[in-house]
Amino acid sequence: MISEAPPFWWRKADWRAWMLAPLSFVYGRVAGHRMAHARRASVSIPVICVGNFTVGGAGKTPTALTIARAAKAKGLKPGFLSRGYGGSLDVTTVVDPHHHRAVAVGDEPLLLAQEALTVISRRRVDGAHRLVAEGADLIIMDDGFQSARLAIDYALLVIDATRGLGNGHIVPAGPVRAPIGQQLRSATALLKVGGGQAADRIVRMAARAAKPYFTASLKVRGDDRLTGIRVLAFAGIADPAKFFRTVESRGAEITVAKTFGDHEHLSEDEIGDILTTAERQDLLIVTTSKDFVRLSGHHGKAQELAQQCRVIEVDMVFDDHLAPGLIIDRAIVACRERRLREMKTKS
């Protein structure tokens, strides 16, 4: 799966999108067929998948964290399941946030592991069974909606209200991962993040398909203001512009903005450039939680940068504060129904 979205994907379709359209047709046919017809393995506990329609960030990880907190408030033991993208380990592993580094397990799993039991696995079915063995009673998948490997009881698709579906084309002509119709049929509900209008069309399509949708927004954690402070902001995430807007919303003046690839581990030269630039211009360094965990556990310049960073942490806040609990309850009911169907089939 492509993880880096070229800029033209997020603009009106141009000659590049149309030139790649034949490849998109083939890719879409394969992806749609897999989602519709693949045999999915089953586990004995509820599975919630937090996915999205497109390649790139939409807020899946903050959403997964919010659902996990709601699960713990209900007395459940949630477990996160991640592929561990960006990490080097290719074996099923329980992530230890005090031992592992992002270079081994990926940045998002490290963030998830700070909240709840987290397993990474290139084979999601193996990872799900490991979570069951570790005592989890609810699995929250961070991504993996289109993989069609594991039976899902509740599929929540997150869509950014500012970016929407981009140019609307399927990979590689655009950011869409599979035919929208098939994705909607496989989804349980949508979560629209932010106040833009780019997601309105897909929300209307979901409504016609009788799919409920929730609304939410990313809120900066705490009351820390940066009013009037000149900063160097850097981000290696799918949508760095969103982070820069968040920094400015705190009152900061972004004097220098540096962007890197999603999940990218910075080189010594890149780190040195950030440190030197900030010192020369007397700038406060600010970054994202994901970028910070990629620096954690290292020595030398990476450690120095981590010590100097101000981390802007955000939470996914549902407009209806009862929504995360409702999602969990419906996943539990759906799991019971799935298990009953499986028992009848076996008998």
From Swiss-Prot:
Q: Does the keyword Nucleotide-binding apply?
A: yes
Q: Which reaction does it catalyse?
A: a lipid A disaccharide + ATP = a lipid IVA + ADP + H(+)
- Kindly list the GO molecular function terms attached to this UniProt entry: ATP binding; tetraacyldisaccharide 4'-kinase activity
Q: List the disulfide bonds.
A: none
The entry marks the following residues as binding ATP, namely T54, V55, G56, G57, A58, G59, K60, T61
Q: Which UniProt keywords apply?
A: ATP-binding, Kinase, Lipid A biosynthesis, Lipid biosynthesis, Lipid metabolism, Nucleotide-binding, Transferase
List, in alphabetical order, the GO biological process terms annotated in this UniProt record.
Answer: lipid A biosynthetic process; lipopolysaccharide core region biosynthetic process
Q: Give the record's family classification.
A: Belongs to the LpxK family.
Q: Can you say what this protein is called? A: Tetraacyldisaccharide 4'-kinase
Tell me what organism the protein belongs to: Rhizobium etli (strain CIAT 652)
The organism's taxonomy opens as:
Bacteria, Pseudomonadati, Pseudomonadota, Alphaproteobacteria, Hyphomicrobiales
State the gene name recorded for this protein: lpxK
